[in-house]
Amino acid sequence: MIKLRKNIANMAGYVPGYQPEDPAAYIKLNTNENSYPPSPKVIEAIIAEVGEGLKRYPDAASRAAREAAAELYGFPPEWVIMANGSDEVLNNLIRAFADEGDEIAFVYPSYSYYATLAEVQGARVKTFGLTEDWKLKDFPKIYEGRIFFLTNPNAPLGFTFSQTYIEELAGRVSGTLVIDETYADFAEVTSLELVRKYDNVVVTRTFSKSYSLAGMRLGLAVARPEVISALDKIRDHYNLDRLAQAAAVAALHDQEYLRETVGKIQETRQWFCDQLGKLGYTVIPSHGNYVFATPPDRNGERIYQGLFDRKILVRHFSDPNLAHGLRISIGTQAEMEKTIVALVEIG
């Protein structure tokens, strides 16, 4: 008889957004992917890497990608680690800093995968709710848990914490403060400077959203060298393949394309929010590539099903505190115009 660890046997596991077998048949606005293609320079770099060199292992340290990220963000390379998606960094941070039975915490609502990763490690989970002015409810003067995850901008709601408040939290977290900046490029805000000021701050980033590389699995973290060294010890030794490393370098070097793509999404986001308002939806002002919108009748499931029937995928959460609304990714202008037409039809 197979005997699993008790925490693994008892956990539910993370449930990602629906991935259709034929994504081209849908307007896909449910997993916050970027509807625009990657930079042409990224495609060129990947194609150039395909060849005889694939028979050799990749650079285990991903040095070229680390150096490109370090140069972009203004840090020495030893302050940066590359990852097979930012989820790998999040996982390894818990492995590095939390023993079985230790407490990790995060904001509710935010990325539910934090809880899954904690359960795998056997850590205890605590959540902190939000006040109306987007601060943490009942957060202690000093939080003594091992890790506190702060998603900024918040997902699924889209608001941002002020940098002043985040710095205040850095001084109130006795363990490690992980600032998950998955959507920061769309907000044009960052807490990277806090890494220089506080030795317990880690900032994570992904290439899945603003760089249009969700299918490549690329992420990174910026932290003090002693933290990066610890993460280096426990990561998979060849965690980024040759194609991913080439893509990362090319993407980081083409900031002009990133700004162009992000700019389009920001413009469409504002247009879409305005249109939702005209339809009577309540929309939380968003700084991500998505919005959280509540229909007038507060029946998010009804709207979700109506859109699904029209081959438009959005995210509806069964959580009773979120079920009234929908998280809708911002696609191209044409995709969002079709979505508005569908919402008018659904009523």
Curated annotation (Swiss-Prot):
Its EC number is 2.6.1.9. Gene3D superfamilies: Aspartate Aminotransferase, domain 1, Type I PLP-dependent aspartate aminotransferase-like (Major domain). It comes from the Bacteria. It catalyses: L-histidinol phosphate + 2-oxoglutarate = 3-(imidazol-4-yl)-2-oxopropyl phosphate + L-glutamate. Pathway: Amino-acid biosynthesis; L-histidine biosynthesis; L-histidine from 5-phospho-alpha-D-ribose 1-diphosphate: step 7/9. The keyword Nuclease does not apply. Belongs to the class-II pyridoxal-phosphate-dependent aminotransferase family. Histidinol-phosphate aminotransferase subfamily. GO terms for biological process: L-histidine biosynthetic process. Homodimer. Its cofactor is pyridoxal 5'-phosphate. CDD domains: AAT_like. The modification N6-(pyridoxal phosphate)lysine is found at K209. SUPFAM superfamilies: PLP-dependent transferases (SSF53383). Keywords: Amino-acid biosynthesis, Aminotransferase, Histidine biosynthesis, Pyridoxal phosphate, Transferase. This is Histidinol-phosphate aminotransferase. One of its GO terms (molecular function) is histidinol-phosphate transaminase activity. The keyword Amino-acid biosynthesis applies. InterPro entries: Aminotrans_II_pyridoxalP_BS, Aminotransferase_I/II_large, HisP_aminotrans, PyrdxlP-dep_Trfase, PyrdxlP-dep_Trfase_major, PyrdxlP-dep_Trfase_small.
